[in-house]
Amino acid sequence: MSNETNSSNFIKNIIINDLETGKHDSIITRFPPEPNGYLHIGHAKSICLNFGLAKEFNGKANLRFDDTNPLKEDVEYVESIKEDVKWLGFDWNELNFASNYFDEMYKRALILIKKGKAYVCDLTQEEMREYRGTLTEPGKESPHRNRTIEENLDLFERMKNGEFKDGEKTLRAKIDMSSPNINLRDPIIYRISHSTHHNTGDKWCIYPMYAFAHPIEDAIEGITHSICTLEFEDQRPLYDWFVKECEMENIPRQIEFARLNINNTVMSKRKLKQLVDEGIVDGWDDPRVPTISGIRRKGYTAEALRNFCSEIGVSKVNSTVDSQMLDYFLRENLQPKAPLTMGVLRPLKLIITNYPEDKIEMLEIENNAKDESQGKRLVPFSRELYIEQDDFMEEPVKKYFRFFPGNEVRLKGAYFVKCTDVIKDENGNVVEIHGTYDPETKSGSGFTGRKVKSTIHWVDAKSAIPCEFRLFEPLILDDIPENEGKHFLEQINPNSLEILQGFVEPTQIKDAKPFDKFQFVRNGFFSIDNKYTTDEKFVFNRIVPLKSSFKPGK
């Protein structure tokens, strides 16, 4: 699958032109998350794009934390973001914090005030909204808009010195209250917040707004191409205004691309936080949420995620990607290397009545059905086995060829076995089935005397390792979860997690560790959970089923 199609990557074309015309000798990009939550798969697209472009064009990429809001940020998120970037396979040129530039930002704000381009305003947030106007009506000027430069300098310094309460005053850019672009109607540059910052402590009680801080940070770092998502397109004129009016030496270019949306998936950080806070999911790393921590715990590989992000490419048009596309890339990634093993998720005991009670036979079974070079393993086989409950049906429906009374099937890598008896409990539930095997039908023996229509997997009851299986379905029922007509909590799937107690064959997993991946015969690709697996018990997360109707390019 080619990575060069990628919507003909218009950002690459911009970079190529900038390098060929000599506008830049080299490029510097950045990934600038706010450390107020865990990164999700949408951020993975941005990480792959920014770091990938820097690598492709022999440039540099910085990791910068836009930590300008002390009320929402935490060191926990800083560390998780660093881990996510590293896990995806990238490293940064510089590790920066917006808060390290607070002194410089303050100086640039003073430049605006001295040029008559910024003023201290006393309007409340509610009053400011009333003055701002609408998309069809111009705004009204603040009564404080024409304060003198001297008065503004004095008030701004007093804001910095902590003389005013939170929300009592703001510093605003003085642009155009009648602009058709609402972002240019005197946006706030600084607000007062008497809060302890995770990096600067209590040094500051005024903090820059993102729209002001971001272009200043980019210019300070010499970023050549400031790549962001499409919702910032209307803010580009403001971005350019701040770079120009703050007299920045370096002039970065903001470029917007469409964000990643995936069906049945909540991508809003605010909504994800609500799911975590209300205990609907098991933390930020719950395998059902699209955080990078969550999909890593579920068992996704960084390579599959990078391939997915490369294939969807970049565009100027918002769209929703089918989640099965990501699953496709995961299967493609795991199929060649995840060792084949047998696990029974919903066990039903099978007793082979004519097999010797004290006999244990070691059978050779392939490690990868599509790659003989991976060899074979020895799997124990004895009189008592476990099979899947749905591999038996007392009264079979049409075209059901697995176990039913009188029917014969092949046990994978073993023998033909015919169902001879059914054991039920006092409530009529099937708890055990009996059968007989034919010693002449051993796999690999060349037996051709008769054929069966079904092969099923199994585990040996004596040696099988008890374990837990966790199966996941989409957390959100609505195909488009951002549907504004419903509250997203109304779309929660009550059956998004199923926990089963079953068994796995011992050969492949006896020395396994968290995050190891396996292909369970007929059941899917699984990964060992890093949170609930203990020395006493393995917990397996199903990453994806084995098959899907999804085909790339359709």
Swiss-Prot record:
Belongs to the class-I aminoacyl-tRNA synthetase family. ATP binds at residues 34-36, 40-46, 229, 259-260, 267-269. The keyword DNA repair does not apply. L-glutamine binds at D66, Y210. A motif ('KMSKS' region) lies at residues 266-270. The keyword Ligase applies. InterPro entries: aa-tRNA-synth_I_CS, Gln-tRNA-synth, Gln/Glu-tRNA_Ligase, Gln_tRNA_ligase_bac, Glu/Gln-tRNA-synth, Glu/Gln-tRNA-synth_Ib_cat-dom, Glu/Gln-tRNA-synth_Ib_codon-bd, Glu_tRNA_lig_a-bdl. A motif ('HIGH' region) lies at residues 33-43. HAMAP family: Gln_tRNA_synth. It is an enzyme of class 6 (ligase). Monomer. Its EC number is 6.1.1.18. Keywords: Aminoacyl-tRNA synthetase, ATP-binding, Cytoplasm, Ligase, Nucleotide-binding, Protein biosynthesis. GO terms for biological process: glutaminyl-tRNA aminoacylation; glutamyl-tRNA aminoacylation. Transmembrane segments: none annotated. It is found in: Cytoplasm. It holds the Pfam family tRNA-synt_1c_C. GO terms for cellular component: cytosol. This is Glutamine--tRNA ligase. Gene3D superfamilies: Glutamyl-trna Synthetase, Domain 2 (1.10.1160.10), Glutamyl-tRNA Synthetase, Domain 3 (3.90.800.10), HUPs (3.40.50.620), Ribosomal Protein L25, Chain P (2.40.240.10). It catalyses: tRNA(Gln) + L-glutamine + ATP = L-glutaminyl-tRNA(Gln) + AMP + diphosphate. One of its GO terms (molecular function) is ATP binding. It comes from Clostridioides difficile (strain 630).
